Curated annotation (Swiss-Prot):
It is found in: Cytoplasm. This is tRNA (guanine-N(1)-)-methyltransferase. Its EC number is 2.1.1.228. Keywords: Cytoplasm, Methyltransferase, S-adenosyl-L-methionine, Transferase, tRNA processing. Its main location: cytoplasm. It catalyses: guanosine(37) in tRNA + S-adenosyl-L-methionine = N(1)-methylguanosine(37) in tRNA + S-adenosyl-L-homocysteine + H(+). The keyword Magnesium does not apply. One of its GO terms (biological process) is tRNA N1-guanine methylation. Pfam families: tRNA_m1G_MT. Specifically methylates guanosine-37 in various tRNAs. The gene is trmD. InterPro entries: Alpha/beta_knot_MTases, tRNA_m1G_MeTrfase_C_sf, tRNA_m1G_MeTrfase_TrmD, tRNA_m1G_MTases_N, tRNA_MeTrfase_TRMD/TRM10. Transmembrane segments: none annotated.
């Protein structure tokens, strides 16, 4: 059933509005748009230029390579975005921003809406950031051609946390980094057939014992994180492992062939 007002509105300020179709045209986010739970609009800064070339960039003061996006068209584009999304926080996608984490996505999902500014070229005039942007967010320590892909990643991560978007609320809570799995990688998942080649589904998952399954999944999540992302495990330790979690992690490590070379201390 369509709602009369979207529960979450996102306005993407971009030179390439067609890229938003990756969100509005496919999968979970498309269903959220179709169901009125998510609204994604675009604003193109070129529509706010005053020359016949629709210029949005210029050479940097002080010299150097590349071009810098101009203040005026971006400021006008953001002002137009605020008309449609007045309570939204303005976020600039940038390698200089704070890392996008599950905790950050959860916090953003509680906002009334978002205005996302996707830069291009060498970046945007710093005066625009000082005057118009509330926060900068990065999706990783690497450089992309523009901010559109990071913006789409952010929209997808936040959309999953909007109530009702996923078919089952536990789907979001059992993702990596969420709920019981905060600061942990996800556990392994299996579906039919029960046997593929010489590989069988772990018997515990066929047992029907929900408590044993829960403990197995938590144990696997702890173990995977210990093996693949020890930095995340340290973050989990910082908030305190429960007695059960420490026991399950110790069991997992003891089961590994090379466990004597590693320690949980």
């Amino acid at each position: 059933m369509m709602t009369t007002k979207p529960t979450f509105a996102v306005t993407l300020v971009t030179l390439f509005p067609e890229m938003a179709q990756a969100i509005t045209g496919f999968g979970v986010t498309r269903r959220a748009v179709d169901n009125g739970q998510l609204q994604v609009e675009t604003v193109n800064p070129r529509d706010f230029t005053e020359d016949r070339h629709r210029t949005v960039d210029d050479r940097p003061f002080g010299g150097g390579p590349g071009m810098v996006m101009k203040v005026e068209p971006l400021a006008k584009a953001l002002q137009a975005a605020r008309v449609a999304n007045p309570a939204a926080k303005v976020i600039y996608l940038s390698p200089q921003g704070q890392p996008l984490t599950q905790a950050k996505a959860t916090a953003l999902a509680e906002q009334p809406g978002l205005i996302l500014l996707a830069g291009r070229y060498e970046g945007v005039d710093e005066r625009l950031l000082d005057a118009e942007v509330d926060e900068q967010i990065s999706i990783g320590d690497y450089v992309l051609s523009g901010g559109e892909l990071p913006a789409l990643v952010l929209i997808d991560a936040v959309s999953r946390l909007i109530p009702g978007v996923l078919g089952h609320q536990d789907s979001a809570e059992q993702d990596s980094f969420s709920g019981e799995f905060e600061n942990l990688l996800d556990c392994p998942h299996y579906t039919r057939p029960e046997v593929y080649g010489e590989q069988a589904v772990p018997p515990v998952l066929l047992s029907g014992n929900h408590e044993l399954i829960r403990r197995w999944r938590l144990k696997q999540a702890l173990g995977r994180t210990w093996q693949q992302r020890p930095d995340l495990l340290e973050a989990r330790r910082a908030r305190g492992l429960s007695k059960e979690e420490q026991q399950l992690l110790d069991e997992y490590i003891a089961e590994q062939p090379s466990h004597t070379a590693k320690t949980t201390d």
